[in-house]
Amino acid sequence: MDSKKYLADWYDAIGFLEQRNGGAILNGVPIPMLQTDIVDEIKNPGKKGTLDVDHIFTAMCVVVGLDEQFPYARDYTHFLRENMEDTLRALEGKILKAAQNDDVERVYLFAHAKEILRGSIEDRLNTTYAMEGIYNARWQEDEGKSSEDLLKEIMDRYEKIIEEDPENTNALMALGRVHEARAHWIKAKFYYEKALQSSGDDGIKEELRRAIETVAEPAAIEGAKTYLHYGRYEEALKTIDEVNSQYTDPGSCSYIKGMAYYGLGDYERAVDYLEESSRHTKAGEVLNDYAIALAALGREEDAIAVLTEIVESNESDRTAFVNRGILYYRSEKFSDAHRDFESAYRLASDNQLWELIEQTRKLAEEE
């Protein structure tokens, strides 16, 4: 993780105390301490001028977890490894306390220090969980716009663990959770199902079953949209028919069915489903496609009425102007067609549209 970007304040929070005459601890390197703890040491000095060992230990772990290139980080890492068992136990306590205080940055610093010292898969997972905490805190500020690099690193770390241990339930489950948060429903379902297969814990299995149930329907809708995109209309219909409860957005199911039937040339069913979809949403894409299906069925006046509804509510819908212009052209209402093509051209120009403008201008003059 880019500590200088996400943990910049910590670089100024660390101070160093020089030891007299080379010092007897830490091989003579300066003693680290957080600035707040230095103040505490001054206000509450220990017996015979001794420093609080926990203050020193905390600062060493912060330095190690913050940046391996930080001054004396290697010295502190070496010292902590010499006392590995006690260090790991103490770090676990600090991680727990930081988590209880919702201090995501300290959780990360201590978890990352633990990863650097030992580096087990469990340590790497805990660091990545902590990175998620930092990402989530940033997301509240700008919906993740400034943290895409962090999210990518989080996903890469989970994927790397899965490469090394394909049956790692925790990593599979975590990656499923990340994809679910990003509305990548198919991938979320895939990783949850893999985690379910690998888990031996009944409690986790039940949690995963609930997660799969949550993403199953949006995953089916996403899959149907993919089939639709590639012109595989029968598969799109089959997939969407597996959605029993019509999800929380029945308009999406109706829209997919309508477009699939349109692709198959069944315009009557296409109109029925697209009309149903239009009852749930007035989105321009849905209404434009509904109008096209009406026109394909020969109901051009109804199609024009739908397109008119669009442009009256959204004067920047270029597609609706073009579509209505084409229908006016087919009805030999060249003045109306010319007006719509000009409106579309003002929103976004292209050569083909300009040719239609010139053509309808001439035809309108002959009317």
Where are these regions (language model features)?
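Structural marker of alpha-solenoid helical repeat scaffolds
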Residues: I116-L117, E164, S198, Q246, ...
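Alpha-helical adaptor scaffolds
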Residues: L125-K152, G251-S313
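Helix-start (N-cap) detector for alpha-helical repeat units in TPR-like alpha-solenoids
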Residues: L88, I121-E122, T169-N170, D202-G203, ...
